[in-house]
Structures are given as structure tokens and as C-alpha cells.
């Protein structure tokens, strides 16, 4: 999740995603209703308040990463240092240290059981995997700069905005 690691580096990190879908649709299959979410994510940023904080800046803001949970190198720019996260979550035991890192979006789409709220499917890193394989020069690129390879990796990656649900006959 760095836009300064000089490449396509899809990996698992100890980060939780705030799904925050921009689009939700419903469908019914075999009498059961499901919700589909496009998990974009979005920071709250208003006059007088912004929750957005890069991982490397937690310590400067007075809430360092818990050294019992995270190796200090995780805050390096080539690791998670540039990842934009929320400053409002993560101190689980109220000791002033961040125990969990929460980033915006899940970079995927998910299917949820509408009755129980349980997640029944998540596409995982497929958007990034497919782009890396088919259009590597556009991997996590922005939509407003022609030469922006990897420019969105520290934000929300492929940033799924919308979805449609249909029937195949």
C-alpha cells in the first residue's frame, strides 16, 4: 500500500479495511436476499476536522503504533508508512497506542446476507491482481493523470465506485 515502492507489490498487511461502500445493490436467490457492496471507502474531511492520517504520522500526532503489535519498520514509506488511515480508530485498550490500523475501503466488492449481515463472499485483491496482469502500466493509477502508475496505492487502490446486478438466463 505504498505509492513509492517502485512497483506492483500486492501483499497482506496487518490492516483492517473500512468497507464504506459507495454503491449497494440487492438481489434474491433461492428465496434469500443478498446485498452487494462496492467497497470504496472515504475519509471524513471537513472544515475543522479531518480523520485522515498516514501510518508514519501516528507517532507525530501523539498516538504511536503499539510496539508489542507492530514492528517499527511497518511505518517506513516502502511498507505502510504512506498508507492513509483513520485516526479515530485503533486504540483498543485506551492506552494511547494504536493496536489496529484501519484503512479506507476494502479494494473489493462483497456479498452480504441481508437477513444476518454476515459476509458470504469477498473478491479480495482481484481488482489489483487483474489490473497488474492485464494492464500493469495502469496499476492503481489515478483517473486524472496519464502517467500515474501506482499513484493510488497509498489511498484506496482501485477504489471500486459502483456496481450493477443482473440476471443471466
Over which residues does each language-model region extend?
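Beta-sheet-rich non-transmembrane sensory/scaffold domains
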Residues: 1-169
Amino acid at each position: 500500500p505504498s505509492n513509492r515502492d517502485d512497483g506492483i507489490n500486492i501483499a497482506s498487511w496487518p490492516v483492517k479495511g473500512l468497507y464504506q461502500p459507495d454503491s449497494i445493490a440487492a438481489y434474491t436467490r433461492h428465496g434469500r436476499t443478498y446485498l452487494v457492496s462496492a467497497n470504496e471507502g472515504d475519509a471524513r474531511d471537513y472544515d475543522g476536522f479531518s480523520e485522515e492520517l498516514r501510518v508514519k504520522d501516528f507517532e507525530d500526532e501523539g498516538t504511536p503504533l503499539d510496539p508489542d503489535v507492530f514492528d517499527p519498520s511497518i511505518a517506513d514509506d516502502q511498507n505502510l508508512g504512506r498508507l492513509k488511515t483513520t485516526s479515530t480508530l485503533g486504540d483498543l485498550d485506551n492506552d494511547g497506542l494504536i493496536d489496529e490500523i484501519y484503512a479506507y475501503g476494502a479494494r473489493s466488492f462483497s456479498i452480504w446476507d441481508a437477513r444476518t449481515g454476515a459476509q458470504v463472499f469477498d473478491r479480495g485483491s482481484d481488482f489489483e491482481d487483474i489490473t497488474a496482469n492485464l494492464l500493469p502500466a495502469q496499476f492503481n493509477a489515478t483517473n486524472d493523470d496519464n502517467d500515474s502508475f501506482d499513484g493510488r496505492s497509498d489511498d484506496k487502490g482501485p477504489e471500486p465506485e459502483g456496481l450493477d446486478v443482473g440476471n443471466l438466463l
